[in-house]
Amino acid sequence: MKSIRHCPAVLIAAPASGQGKTTVTAALARLHRNQGRKVRVFKCGPDFLDPMILERASGAPVYQLDMWMVGEQESRRLLWEAAGEADLILIEGVMGLFDGTPSSADLARHFGVPVLGVIDGTAMAQTFGALALGLAKYQPDLPFAGVLANRVGTLRHAQLLEGSLTEGLRWYGALSRETGIELPSRHLGLVQASELNDLDVRLDAAADALASSCEVALPPAVEFAAPDVLEAEPLLAGVRIAVARDEAFAFTYGASLDLLRAMGAELSFFSPIRDTELPEADSLYLPGGYPELHHVALSQNTSMLTAIRAHHAAGKPLLAECGGMLYLLDSLTDVEGTRAELVGLLAGDAVMQKRLAALALQSVEMPEGLLRGHTYHHSLTSTELEPIARGLSPNGGRGAEAVYREGRMTASYVHFYFPSNPSAIAALFAPDLKDAFASKLAPTVDGVVPEEMRSPVGASLLAKRP
């Protein structure tokens, strides 16, 4: 019989984006952390920016949960492991509660986590009650804890909102409209946590405001069942992977880096903006981020541009995602028209747009196997390169992203979720494919890997083999 773990948990959702879910989730996390509790926070969907804020608020790593990209079993593993160490689990939803396929509501219902609805009360009175009732009753089998009003003006305003609730809906309180606790944003979402010098001040202020006006007792405990756990094969044993990490390149999934380590890789981090050379590495990973905000500085670091060109010329593996791909192009032009010449390994140019260019989950059939991920960008790229593959959106979202390849270099707008297919990822990073995958194109744990060399990483390893 699988073991059961119990932990108080709640999913923070809203009728739409921009209601203040992240502010409320971060405030709850910081409040309970300040009271001495261990808080684990998760984020629904593929977002990178909200987890950075939530990590600062909780003091613990934040991972994504998604019934499609992450998968049911891997989501179950992450929650079960958190329940074994935490006093409280918080899950921040994505978009509106019922938006998307799968939605935040789908995840809450599947794992039995009650929903706390956050509604922006600005310029609203009795209509608040109608929105709250809709969130609670639209899907009758959805566990619903109650509602919290955000951006409330006065005590009288809060009383009007509370008085609008019907059918026994629970009122969790009101968070005031204070600029000191709001989190600033830009074109891809919230500003990165590392760029906010006063972030801890904002988080503590939000926690104090929440404590003074809202119900903040621990929610009821939720049962979390143990997942089916497989073992990671050491397909990257001893492989040294250099990972770009600075204010221009910060969009990495914690679960993806965990997987690389579990497969035996040794990770080292470097800054394409400040460092003049790459770390000693067999392979290179350029994740997404905000290169458009730093493209002039990136262009001026000619030593790093030369080092990356040399890495590719040596026939070493290189994976570049979204902003990492833009860095490899001939040039990048920002919305103000400032053009900077970059690495030049991919023949083409990119221009930033003021409007969204693509937003979609992506399923990509690569030569190495099927990988899942997502795309979200404001740039348009022009190139004559022929893609080796194109992504498909499982729910009709905007974007059928190309994947380009030159030698051992693979580049795409897609942010890949590595645990969706570990052996495909290993093939992308392995320095010598012949040695790494000789006689084991379809490896199995029992047939290939000695038991003493295995390490647990979770049920996500059920993914397709190349």
Question: Where on the chain are the PLM-derived regions?
Answer:
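ATP-dependent carboxylate-amine ligase catalytic core
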Residues: K2-F111, I119-L142, L155-Q159
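A short helix->loop->beta-strand "cap" motif at the edges of active sites that frequently abuts
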Residues: V113, L169, A313-P317
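Internal gly/pro-rich beta-alpha loop/helix module
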Residues: A125-E233
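Amide-donor transfer/coupling interface in amidating biosynthetic enzymes
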Residues: E182-V229, P234-G238, A350-K434
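Phosphate-binding active sites in nucleotide-utilizing proteins
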Residues: V239-A313
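Cysteine-nucleophile active-site neighborhood
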Residues: L267, P291-P367
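Intrinsic, low-complexity polybasic segments
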Residues: A438, P450, A459-S460
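Short, low-complexity intrinsically disordered segments enriched in A/P/G/S/L with frequent Arg
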Residues: L441-A442, A463-R465
